[in-house]
């Protein structure tokens, strides 16, 4: 009887609900980190497979979200360092870029940033996380997150100015 009550109290953490609520966020973060749709799909699947193993230990909805993002970062890091990944050659999925179409895409410019800056920008501006939340998720110092955001903004500013000339 006690375990049934515990499951009802942890309704927010049920894998199906977590997937419906956070799958898009997890996928977008994976895509920002890998720049590849199929790798992002693999990471999304791996994240929720890992989550299914531990979902009953979640204490609050904030813990669910933080854990999913942390697993996403770890999975994307693992993918980049795997021997399989090192032996593969990626295809350019954007065969027609926005530059060829005569347009300017801020997302294209963000995707050109180094991964640490790209991740911080995505979590801060696209997901709406505070500096402290990003620091907790990435397990880095809040001042490091601020530095990443400042440098990313400077790089984007220079790119935009160069494109305007």
Indicate residue ranges for each PLM-predicted region:
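A short, charge-rich alpha-helical start-of-domain segment used by transcription regulators
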Residues: 2-28, 41, 52
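Short amphipathic alpha-helical boundary/capping segments
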Residues: 7, 15, 105-114
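Sigma70-family region 2
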Residues: 8, 35, 46-63, 82-83
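Structural recognition of an alpha-helix C-terminal capping motif at a helix-to-coil junction
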Residues: 28, 42-49, 62-74
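Arg/Lys-rich amphipathic alpha helix in sigma70-family domain 2
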Residues: 59-60, 69-89, 151
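Internal acidic/polar
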Residues: 78, 83-111, 130
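A short pre-motif secondary-structure segment
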Residues: 120-124
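DNA-recognition helix of helix-turn-helix
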Residues: 138-162
